[in-house]
Design a protein with these regions (language model features):
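Conserved AMP-binding/adenylate-forming core of the ANL superfamily
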Residues: 10-15, 31-76, 80-84, 101-106, ...
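Conserved pre-ATP/AMP-binding loop-to-beta segment of ANL
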Residues: 31, 158-161, 167-188, 195, ...
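Structural core segment of the AMP-binding/adenylate-forming
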Residues: 38, 56, 60-61, 84, ...
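A short helix-loop-beta submotif of the ANL/AMP-binding
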Residues: 68, 74-94, 98-102, 107-116, ...
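AMP-binding/adenylate-forming catalytic core of the ANL superfamily
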Residues: 100, 106, 117-119, 356, ...
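AMP-binding/adenylate-forming catalytic domain of the ANL superfamily
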Residues: 143, 493-514, 533-541
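Conserved AMP-binding/adenylation subdomain of ANL enzymes
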Residues: 207-224, 232-272, 281-283, 287
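Gly/Ser/Thr-rich phosphate-binding loop
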Residues: 263, 268-276, 285-343, 354-355, ...
Length: 541
């Protein structure tokens, strides 16, 4: 059983809300830096004052308790202040993926029911393109370096408002005092397996996500936490900004993830801990080795999921590593600690807070060693999603048989370690065998000429599916399909060796580095796809 850290239990019961955390920090650490940027430092008090000014401006704009407000902003201090301002009002934050456009963007805007969006000026053209499709939006607040719009101008049926008009001079605001069951946000999932869904997030849900990361990284008040993730994503907002506030630590706010700049930024700010998605850790690991790789300030890194070379990663960069498994809907029910049992685990269940079962298609529990869908139940109220926004039918389907169905295939071993196998939609059924796309990807990525790869199912001629891999070579490399198959023949069972290969310069991804496999599945086989069977290249049986 995983034991949670008592130090992170400061905000118990009804105090597990953003409002209580900020109020506490203003008393005990008001002048301490909460956020560091390339241009300055911002204390807890600085951001609270800015949040008060913005809360007064939003109230004047007509925003009230329970209203949804869209934030489509790049990483900036104003994003954090607006998040706090909306919480002060009791309004509901709806972060927008900054890469959304077209119908995907208009769907999210309309589905949220928001009347107000605050958007960076660089996204104004995208909003303009779909403005005629907006059903409820009445106000667009434009923020950024571009010339601000004339107040009262129109975007479709919505009025344009300069950011300066909501930035009042009054820093004082009588904040709403929420409870853990009050709604804080609607977080739209990143859409790696289909259209985005709005997850209803309570204060308790967001708090527990952030508090859990404190345990996973052993975050202390003295820590400087650097994780180059976008604030519109839960990992950027809760696992970093919110976690350091609960711990009383300091966070570094980056713009975007850059493998080339990562270590220099860590050294610049003396960062001691970080959170890396597996794709980010993989790119860091695949950078050319340098003599000073271990000469950095990082001590602890949370990598989700682990890279197969995690032990080499730890030694090369001189860090401890832990991992977890989770998602927007179900939070993070597992912890590994820094003593990793192996390079494939995603931790053990935190039995104080969650129940997790591995089940078959009829929700019957499966024994250790057998992969199935992971289903979750909380032991404490309000720490997983309250449902899907405006889609009760999706909520009922997700919570069938009184368990939250995650859509993730996991497997448990006899010692209670859990292993991520695949997304249920990414699992491939070929000739009676279930194939993990992630396992095939790991072997392809081990080829010295490969930077990264995505493996997807495509329809077979008769029944079931075939394996297709989209491969991104390393710069300057041009691996032959036949050579890659020969490499995989020695590393994979015959039925897992891809039939189809396609080489690409890049893979479609979310801003947090997750490969958007649904886009690859929809595209499927193309004119550029190489067919192993047509080329008469055999596999070893």
């Amino acid at each position: 059983m995983i034991q949670t850290a008592p130090a992170s239990r400061l905000f118990n019961g009804e105090a597990a809300t953003l409002a209580h955390v900020l109020a506490h920090r203003l008393v005990d650490a008001g002048e301490k830096p909460w956020i560091l940027t390339a241009t300055g430092r911002f204390t807890y008090r600085d951001i609270d004052r800015l949040a008060g000014r913005l809360a007064n401006g939003l109230i004047r704009l007509g925003v009230g308790r329970g209203d949804t407000v869209l934030l489509m902003l790049n990483n900036c201090i104003e994003f954090i202040a607006l998040w706090c301002a909306l919480a002060k009002i009791g309004a509901i934050e709806v972060p927008v993926n900054c890469h959304y456009k077209g119908r995907l963007l208009s769907h999210l805007v309309n589905d949220s029911g928001a009347r107000v969006i605050i958007a960076d000026s660089e996204f104004f053209p995208r909003l303009s393109e779909v403005s005629n499709a907006f059903s409820a939006l009445s106000t667009v607040v434009i923020y950024g370096a571009a010339p601000e719009p004339r107040s009262g101008a129109l975007l479709g049926a919505a009025h344009l408002v300069p950011y300066a008009e909501i930035l009042t001079d009054n820093e004082q605001f009588a904040a709403f005092s929420p409870a853990p069951w009050d709604q804080l946000a609607v977080m739209y999932t990143s859409g790696t397996t289909g259209p985005s869904k709005g997850v209803i997030v309570t204060h308790g849900h967001a708090f527990e996500y952030a508090r859990g990361v404190i345990d996973m990284l052993d975050i202390r008040p003295s820590d400087v936490y650097y994780a180059p993730l976008p604030l519109f994503h839960i990992a950027g907002q809760w696992a970093v900004v919110y976690a350091v506030a609960i711990a009383g630590a300091t966070a570094v706010l980056p713009d975007t993830f850059s493998p080339a700049r990562f270590w220099s930024t860590c050294r610049q700010h003396k960062a001691t801990c970080s959170f890396l998605l597996g794709a980010m850790a993989n790119l860091l690991y695949r950078q050319p080795p340098a003599s000073d790789d271990a000469d950095n300030t990082l001590e602890r890194v949370l990598i989700v999921p682990l890279v197969p070379e995690v032990e080499d990663f730890k030694q090369r960069f001189g860090v401890l590593v832990s991992t977890t498994w989770g998602g927007t809907e179900m939070n993070c029910p597992t912890r590994s600690g820094f003593e990793l049992p192996n390079a494939r685990t995603c931790g053990r269940v935190d039995n104080d807070l969650y129940e997790v079962r591995i089940v078959d298609e009829n929700d019957n529990e499966l024994p250790p060693g057998v992969a199935g869908e992971a289903v979750v139940r909380p032991r404490k109220p309000w720490i997983v999603m309250a449902g899907y926004w405006r889609h009760p039918e999706w909520t009922v389907q997700a919570w069938r048989n009184l368990w939250l169905h995650t859509g993730d295939m996991l497997m448990a071993d006899a010692e209670g370690n859990l292993y991520f196998v695949d997304r249920t939609k990414d699992a491939i059924r070929r000739r009676g065998e279930n194939i993990s796309s992630m396992e095939v990807e790991q072997e392809i990525n081990a080829h010295p000429d490969v930077l990264e790869a995505a493996v997807i199912p495509v329809a077979a001629e008769v029944t079931e599916q075939e394996v297709m891999a989209i491969v991104v070579p390393k710069p300057g490399c041009n691996p032959a399909p036949e050579a890659l198959i020969a490499f995989l023949n020695d590393r994979l069972p015959y039925f897992m060796v891809p039939r189809y290969l396609e080489f690409a310069s890049e893979l479609p991804k979310t801003p947090t580095g997750k490969i958007q496999k649904y886009a690859l599945r929809e595209r499927g086989i193309t004119a550029k796809t190489w067919d192993r069977i047509q080329a008469a290249v055999p596999v070893k049986k």
